[in-house]
Amino acid sequence: MARVLLAEPNRLVCRFIAGILTDFGHDVTACEDCTEAAARLTIGPIDVLVTDMVLRDGEGSTFCKHCVTRGIRTITLSGHEFRDAQAEQDCPPPLVEKPFRLDDLQDVVDAVAAAAGSTRAAA
């Protein structure tokens, strides 16, 4: 199980993705903008950031870079098509394009969480 910080500006999409990640077994903290997400970082450790490319009060890519400097693994979601070079410049991989398959999201989050060393065997 990973401690996931989810930053998604659309309230319904945020709740949906948070529910999915919780069903996958992760401990999810959800927020809708950069300010709230930054505040959540001060509360406790986060293993994985899952953020939309564009948030209400800033760019998810900028917040993503901030998290990377803190050693937090990141996953960026986007409803826009990006060229590979543009996506890599704007945010570290992986980039998951919306709409996505639930299994694909689970695979990416699990892989990033494992790389962060936060997963553990099911009891």
Task: Identify the residue ranges that each predicted region occupies.
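Conserved acidic carboxylate
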Residues: 8
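As written
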Residues: 88-96
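C-terminal output helix
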Residues: 100-117, 121-122
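Acidic, metal-coordinating helix/loop segments flanking the phosphotransfer/catalytic sites
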Residues: 30-48
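Two-component/phosphorelay signaling modules centered on CheY-like receiver
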Residues: 11-29
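Hydrophobic/aromatic residues positioned on beta-strands within the core alpha/beta folds
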Residues: 75-79
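Acidic phosphotransfer microenvironment of two-component signaling modules
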Residues: 11, 32-36, 103
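Conserved phosphotransfer microenvironments
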Residues: 51-68
